Design a protein with these regions (language model features):
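Charged, compositionally biased, marginally structured helical/coil segments
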Residues: 1-55
């Protein structure tokens, strides 16, 4: 899952930086891009939680 998350982070660096600046909505968009690219192979809640840990 982590490698997929990093793929999304690298594809949307602007969303990562806006999340780091306090925009919590950006995390939802990152999860949305993850689902769009990889489908529901992983639980979106787990993906979201893991993204928070990695950012």
């Amino acid at each position: 899952m982590d490698s997929r998350i990093y793929t999304i982070f690298n594809s949307y660096p602007d969303l990562v930086s806006s999340y780091q600046s306090g925009s919590t909505a950006s995390l939802g968009l990152l999860v949305g891009h993850y689902i769009k690219q990889f489908g529901f192979t992983d639980d979106p809640v787990k993906v979201s939680r893991r993204m928070k840990e990695l950012i």
